[in-house]
């Protein structure tokens, strides 16, 4: 895909993630035989407005040491849906030759079980410098996203969007046909809500609350 759009792609994998300052991506993926990695795609004019897309790329989610029930694990190859969506959107943007400076970040991992798996009770220092105590290893999506979001924020893009299969609580709240949307941008919220109706792919805005 990158070659079609003449985009540049870099990736950091395995132990290099620790050296480069992405400890939560490494922690979630280190138990797998497939090395965790951060994929970084860039495209467009340096003079164009910056847009950054971040997609959750959990290629399989066993739940880690807080193992999922077998029925819940069956479809967890779909836990990379966020990554698939941002790649599809990036492909559309490049094919349409939109006047934007695009960056795509995908933390790609498998949340597996082994002797090296991260554990409930572990305390991990994230890329932003904040520490997080692991309460449940099956809440891995927010961990890999936090390092990617911290990296994306360093370049201060004009628009930053992340897409993720983040929690079953969204299904409890909204059912199976409506996706949850969170944003602090009122104009963007209105435009996305309107277009979701037009495209018959509905979104429902939920509040962001800092506590």
Residue ranges: model-predicted function:
Residues 2-211:
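A generic structural signal for tightly packed, nonpolar segments enriched in small/aliphatic residues
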């Amino acid at each position: 895909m990158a070659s079609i759009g003449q985009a540049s792609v870099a990736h950091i994998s395995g132990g290099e993630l620790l050296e480069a300052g992405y400890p939560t991506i490494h922690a979630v993926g280190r138990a797998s035989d497939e090395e965790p990695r951060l994929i970084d795609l860039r495209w467009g004019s340096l003079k164009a407005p910056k847009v950054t897309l971040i997609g959750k790329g959990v290629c399989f989610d066993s739940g880690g040491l807080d193992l999922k029930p077998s029925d819940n694990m069956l479809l967890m190859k779909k836990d990379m849906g966020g990554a698939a969506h941002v790649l599809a959107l990036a492909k559309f943007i490049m094919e349409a030759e939109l006047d934007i400076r695009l960056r795509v970040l995908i933390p790609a991992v498998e949340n597996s079980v082994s002797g090296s798996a991260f554990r409930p009770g572990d305390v991990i220092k994230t890329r932003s410098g904040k520490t997080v105590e692991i309460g449940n290893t099956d809440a891995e999506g927010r961990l890999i996203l936090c390092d990617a979001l911290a990296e994306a924020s360093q370049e201060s893009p004009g628009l930053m969007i992340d897409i993720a299969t983040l929690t079953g609580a969204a299904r409890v709240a909204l059912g199976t046909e409506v996706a949850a949307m969170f944003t602090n941008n009122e104009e963007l919220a209105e435009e996305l809500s309107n277009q979701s109706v037009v495209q018959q792919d509905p979104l429902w805005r939920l509040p962001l609350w800092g506590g």
